[in-house]
Structure formats: C-alpha cells, structure tokens
C-alpha cells in the first residue's frame, strides 16, 4: 500500500480517467492502412500470381486435341515438325471444343539396341516415353524402329484392332504400316527442311519420313481406353487406303 506521503499531494482531478479520444472514420482508415499495408501488398501479389497462372493455364495455353508420339534416334527438323502438325490437324476434329484442331508431336529420342547412341539422350527419352505411356498421352506412334519399340514397351496393337499377347512382340510387323504404305501420309505437303538446332543437313521432309512406320496403341484397361479413344478417328483417317508391307522380308 502506498504511504500517505505519496498520496497526500495527489489532486483528485488526476484520479479521473482520461476521456478516450474518438477517432474519425478517416483517421481509423488511415491507421488501418498503416498497420496492414504490407499484408495487403503481399496477399495482392500472391493473388495476382495465382490468377495469372490460372488464366495462362486454362485460357492462354493451347490444348491439343491429339497427341502423336515420334520415337527415333534423333529429333525431327523443326520445319518438318511444324508442317506435319499442321497437316495432321486437317484429318482430325475439334475434340476439346476450343474452335480449332491442334495436333502436338511429342518427340522421344531413343536408339534401341544401339551401342553408338547418346546415353544421356536415351535416358531422357526413356523417361519421357515411359511417362507418356503410363499416362496414355499419345495414341498414335510414328516410329523409326518399330521392332525395338514393341520389344521394349509392348504397347502396340494389331492393325485389325486385336490386342497382342505378351509373347507376341516379335510379330511387330502386323502392328504397323510403313509411312509409304499410307496414301494419306505420303500425300501431305510437308515441304523441305534446312539445317537448324537439331539437324545439320537439309532435305525433303517426305523423303526423311519414308523410313518411318506408324502404329496405334493398344488399350488393355478401361481407364486407358477412355483416354485413347479420341485417337481412333484420326488413325482411321490417316491410314485410309493403306496396305501394310511391313512384313515383307520377315
């Protein structure tokens, strides 16, 4: 308890509580901004970033109607890829309803059973191709080495639509057409290519693709079948009138 010596000089007026100041609405608003401005900026920037990513992903990004894989020891020239994507789109439909038909070529560099191949490119290609197959991304495959591809992945189906048994990989020639077997493919205007970042030579794109084959994935599960079904009409259009010669010499 405080002593009388300290209490005797206290003015009773000093014991009255001070009247609390009433701030105006403008002053309260200014104080709120002083304390919270940095948080408003932080959340505003974060929100703008999320909105940008959302808009970019769903409205500004072109989503392909079809994914077609190219598996070969080297990348196709950029000019060939661009021309081929445009020509393939002419035989497809607008599956996602965005008003245009887009075909995307997914290139995977793999040299099956080759000791001279680039190990880094083969590893990268194997990883990407495995992801494609596991996610049922590409339904149609343009192949440089269909025998090596089928032996490694076992994903192709027979040309008549039947699914091969697990020990039928050596029967690969009944699962593909040569590029030159398909009148639709050989009739495409693909132009020529010049040296670029992935190709040191120049030449005709159709001549380059003449050594390739084309096949379609088999679907052993309902989930993969539903993901791959959009590729069926495109496959039928591209192989219309084709007669396979892949088995000649086997």
Task: Show which residues each predicted segment covers.
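Acidic, glycine-anchored loop motifs typical of Ca2+
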Residues: 94-119
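Short, polar/charged alpha-helical segment
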Residues: 78-100
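Extracytoplasmic/periplasmic C-terminal soluble domains
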Residues: 163-250
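Extracytoplasmic "Venus flytrap"/periplasmic binding protein-like
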Residues: 118-184
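Short, well-ordered beta-strand elements
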Residues: 65-74
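Hydrophobic membrane-insertion alpha-helices, especially the h-region
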Residues: 35-57
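Cytosolic juxtamembrane amphipathic/interface segments immediately preceding
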Residues: 22-32
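N-terminal intrinsically disordered, acidic low-complexity segments at the extreme N-terminus
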Residues: 1-20
């Amino acid at each position: 308890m405080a002593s009388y010596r300290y209490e005797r000089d206290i003015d009773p007026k000093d014991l009255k509580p001070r009247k609390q100041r009433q701030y105006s609405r403008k002053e309260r608003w200014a104080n709120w901004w002083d304390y919270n401005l940095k948080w408003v900026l932080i959340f505003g920037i974060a929100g703008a970033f999320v909105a940008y990513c959302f808009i970019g992903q769903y409205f500004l990004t072109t989503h392909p109607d079809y994914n077609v894989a190219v598996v070969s020891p080297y990348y196709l020239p950029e000019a060939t890829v661009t021309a081929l994507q445009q020509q393939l789109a002419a035989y497809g439909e607008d599956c996602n309803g965005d008003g245009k038909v887009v075909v995307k070529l997914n290139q995977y560099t793999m040299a099956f059973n080759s000791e001279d191949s680039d190990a880094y490119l083969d590893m990268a290609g194997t990883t990407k191709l495995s992801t494609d197959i596991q996610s049922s991304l590409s339904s149609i495959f343009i192949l440089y080495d269909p025998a090596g591809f089928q032996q490694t992945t076992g994903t192709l189906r027979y040309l008549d639509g039947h699914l091969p048994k697990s020990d039928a990989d050596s029967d690969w020639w009944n699962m593909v057409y040569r590029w030159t077997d398909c009148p639709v493919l050989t009739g495409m205007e693909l132009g020529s290519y010049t040296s670029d970042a992935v190709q040191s030579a120049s030449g005709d794109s159709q001549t380059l693709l003449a050594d390739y084959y084309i096949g379609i994935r088999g679907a052993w599960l309902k989930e993969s079948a539903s993901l791959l079904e959009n590729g069926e009409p495109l496959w039928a259009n591209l192989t219309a009138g084709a007669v396979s010669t892949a088995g000649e010499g086997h």
